[in-house]
UniProtKB/Swiss-Prot annotation:
Keywords, in A-Z order: Cell membrane, Glycoprotein, GPI-anchor, Lipoprotein, Membrane, Signal
Name of the protein in its database record: Putative uncharacterized protein
Glycosylation sites per record: 232, 241, 461, 511, 669
Residues spanning the signal sequence: 1-18
Positions of the propeptide removed during maturation: 720-741
Location within or outside the cell: Cell membrane
Comp. bias (Polar residues): 646-656
Segments of skewed composition (Low complexity): 183-197, 205-266, 433-451, 512-528
Region (Disordered): 142-300, 423-528, 646-681
Lipoprotein found in the keyword field: yes
Induction (record text): Up-regulated upon milbemycins A3 oxim derivative (A3Ox) treatment.
Species this chain originates from: Candida albicans (strain SC5314 / ATCC MYA-2876) (Yeast)
Source species taxonomy: Eukaryota, Fungi, Dikarya, Ascomycota, Saccharomycotina
Membrane topology listed for this record: Lipid-anchor; GPI-anchor
């Protein structure tokens, strides 16, 4: 009797494939639950198992029970429960929407109850323990318990050869079978339905037809097309290249290659289409409900994955910096799902913190559980049931961009996600290649390396998605080096041979820096004169003996007139520094190599500003007077100012030298002149003896290189006999100066 039930299911499975029928499923509290219609009150429930199959009409956006005109909806006025209605007039006009495998109702739905089966309501008012349910998933094949026992056929055994058949397992539907149990699916021969299967081998074509009820067994024929499904492994279909599968029985029609062309062609096309669809879906294995969402597609969340998205107009990959999920900084992040936890780079776990930031934690129990990744996107089971696919956004940080869950935090949203499986060894090879390529700064263009064609074919057939390409905009290299720019004209063209060996070796030879001084440009400009006058004044009170009256008087000890005449010289020196030698060795084969040496030079232009400042000081003699006294002979003093443009030696042989006398010859014993500090660190020597009128000239060099001025005062004249300039003094003053010397 079990055999008849299984065959009935197979007939139903064929009808489902032919008419796009499906079951409806969701996940609540990490359990797969299916839409089930209560046969008593026609209410729609969510239960662990169901045989109800549905179909969707895109033109009317209605969900029908398969093979009937009964629709699934609710009555807005008197029945808030989701039910099956045979008469559309007694139901609401709300419909459904189907996007790929995502099924949504046009009104919010709630599931109520403490445990399955749950009731589905559009209005939970007055009901307890209700939670909102957003979306459903469609399952293209119904759920079937695996049969592991041998079932014997109730009837007489035929004397002829017995047919050996196997039942094919669903390739994309999660089952309740324990993970450690191995299930052996096989080719199925149906009763009362003529089927045709054609091998995809290009050399031969085999047609299998049967109209009898075969004996069921779990034995696998050695030459038959077999499909093996194991937990945590991808399904692989193996086809025999030499022999074909033939099922024969006593009452069956003859199985030959001479079937009618019309039926053979039609059935072959249908079968090949079905086989191709099954092979496309076979890359995803059935996983536990906690770790796998709706089945189907090419993404396997239990093996390494990389995730990319569009960000600011560019496709970027998810990275990690050992603390957070990031963009454009850190290392490439590979993801896996283990028991609903999202693992990163095999050593970290993703946790959504209170700020909704994707942070990385060391312990699995501290991470967020409920992640589901498949072809339809990234999902997070929150509050115990499915929600829409989650969205992500990125906010700028000091070290780059950090990824947040959701878009309500004001960050820039990410979209157009792509998820690709990648092998661990391919990740290692990719990282090694990236490191090698970033270390090389110069390489010779040559033919690309090719691998064995057989290995390439096997890799393309076994299929996992290719690793992300090394696009600088997508995956920035973690290693940076200083690259020397080489003129393309310096590269030597090497003709490739039949088996070229492209070996580029770059070495930096330590060498002393070579400095070459180039052109020197000097520009001199004169500035205007700057004059400063400094007076030293003292007040003296004279009192006579026996007289109480005292007379105050003012004495000008000295007057210093300082004149600056700066001359600025601008000098530009071009210096060429050779500080790097690069040797590039290119080998055509093991014996022929060529070495090319490149010298990298740096040109430095040094600008020096030099200021030649001629400082002339005029020191006057002391004068006495009352409180209103002023400098005597001020015009005479001004006439004695020496400028750099004038160079007149004093005339000591003048006939009037003996006749002219100074205004005050006697020294002022009460007055002592203090040393005078000259600006710009200049040094002036002024006698503190009987002070007379004198002139001191000092030359100051101020050299400025870059932004750091250097002041170096250089006294030019040591005494009055070496003064450079023009001195206009009376004969008596000149005689006194000569006597002092």
């Amino acid at each position: 009797m079990k055999t008849i039930s299984i065959l009935a299911f197979l007939v139903l499975a064929r009808l489902i494939e032919a008419n796009d029928l499906f079951q409806v499923k969701t996940i609540i509290d990490y359990q797969d639950l299916y839409l089930h219609i209560n046969p008593n009150n026609f209410q729609v429930k969510l239960s662990h198992s169901s045989t109800d199959v549905f179909e969707f009409d895109e033109s009317s956006n209605k969900l029908f029970c398969a093979g009937t005109n009964d629709i699934i909806t609710y009555n807005k006025e008197n029945c808030p429960y989701l039910m099956k209605f045979a008469d559309e007039s007694s139901s609401s006009v709300l419909g459904w929407s189907l996007d790929r495998q995502t099924l949504r109702f046009d009104h919010d739905l709630y599931f109520c109850g403490t445990k399955p089966p749950y009731s589905l309501l559009a209005d939970p008012s007055g009901s307890a323990n209700c939670r909102k349910l957003n979306i459903f998933r469609t399952v293209l094949e119904p759920k079937v318990e695996k049969e592991e026992e041998e079932e014997e056929y109730d009837g007489e055994e035929d004397d002829d050869d017995e047919s050996l058949t196997e039942f094919e397992s669903s390739t994309d539907f999660p089952t309740m079978t324990d993970e450690s149990t191995e299930v052996e699916p096989s080719t199925t021969t149906e009763s009362a339905i003529s089927t045709t299967e054609t091998s995809k081998d290009e050399e031969s074509s085999t047609t299998v037809e049967s109209t009898t009820t075969p004996k069921t067994t779990t034995t696998t024929s050695a030459d038959s097309v077999t499909t093996t499904s194991k937990s945590n492994e991808s399904l692989t279909t193996t086809e025999s290249n030499e022999s074909s599968t033939t099922t024969e029985s006593k009452d069956s029609s003859t199985t030959t290659d001479e079937s009618t062309p019309e039926s053979s062609t039609t059935e072959t096309d249908k079968t090949e289409t079905t086989i191709e669809e099954q092979e496309e879906e076979s890359t995803t294995s059935s996983q536990s409900e906690e770790t796998e969402g709706p089945s189907g597609g090419n993404v396997d969340s239990t093996v390494a994955m990389v995730i990319s998205a569009m960000f600011q107009g560019d496709r970027v990959y998810f990275y990690s910096d050992d603390k957070y999920i990031t963009l454009l900084n850190g290392d490439l992040a590979t993801f896996k799902i283990d028991d609903g936890y999202l693992q990163v780079n095999n050593n970290k776990w993703v946790n959504v913190n209170i700020e909704r930031l994707l942070e990385l934690v060391d312990n699995q129990e501290d991470a967020t559980q409920g992640w589901i990744i498949n072809d339809e996107g990234i999902f997070l089971v929150q509050d115990g049931f499915y929600s829409d696919s989650v969205s992500f956004s990125a906010c700028g940080h000091d070290s780059g961009y950090r990824v947040y869950l959701g878009e309500e935090n004001g960050c820039e949203p990410l979209n157009q996600f792509r998820i690709m499986n990648i092998e661990e060894d391919e990740i290692d090879e990719t990282e090694t290649t990236e490191s090698t390529k970033t270390t090389e700064t110069t390489k010779t263009t040559g033919p690309a390396e090719t691998t064995d064609s057989a290995e390439s074919t096997d890799d393309s057939n076994e299929s996992s998605a290719p690793p992300p390409t090394e696009d600088p905009s997508d995956i920035p290299s973690a290693t940076t080096t200083d690259e020397a720019t080489v003129d393309p004209s310096d590269e030597q063209s090497i003709a490739p041979t039949s088996e070229p060996i492209d070996e580029s070796t770059e070495s930096e030879e330590p060498n002393e820096s070579v400095t070459v001084t180039g052109d020197t440009t000097t520009d001199t400009s004169e500035q205007g004169l700057t004059t400063f006058t400094t007076e030293t004044t003292a007040t003296v009170t004279d009192c006579e003996d026996g007289d109480d009256s005292c007379t105050p008087r003012t004495t000008i000890r000295s007057t210093v007139i300082t004149t600056h005449c700066p001359i600025v010289t601008k000098t530009e020196v071009e210096t060429i520094v050779t500080d790097l030698t690069i040797t590039l060795t290119t080998c055509i084969d093991e014996t022929i190599c060529e070495a090319t040496t490149f010298v990298v030079s740096t040109t430095v232009v040094t600008t020096t500003l030099t200021t030649h400042s001629v400082v002339t000081e005029y020191v006057s003699s002391a004068h006495e007077g009352d409180g209103s006294s002023t400098i005597a002979n001020e015009d005479k003093h001004n006439d004695a100012i020496v400028t750099p443009q004038e160079t007149v030696a004093p005339d000591t042989n003048s006939p009037d030298a003996d006749q002219e006398q100074p205004d005050s010859v006697e020294p002022d014993n009460e007055t002592t002149d203090a040393p005078i500090n000259v600006e710009d660190d200049a040094t002036a020597l002024i006698s503190d003896e009987d002070t007379t009128t004198s002139t001191i000239t000092t030359l100051i060099y101020i050299t400025q290189s870059g932004d750091q001025p250097i002041k170096t005062p250089v006294p030019i004249f040591d005494n009055a006999a070496n003064l450079a300039g023009s001195i206009s003094l009376s004969s008596g003053v000149l005689l006194l100066i000569l006597m002092l010397i």
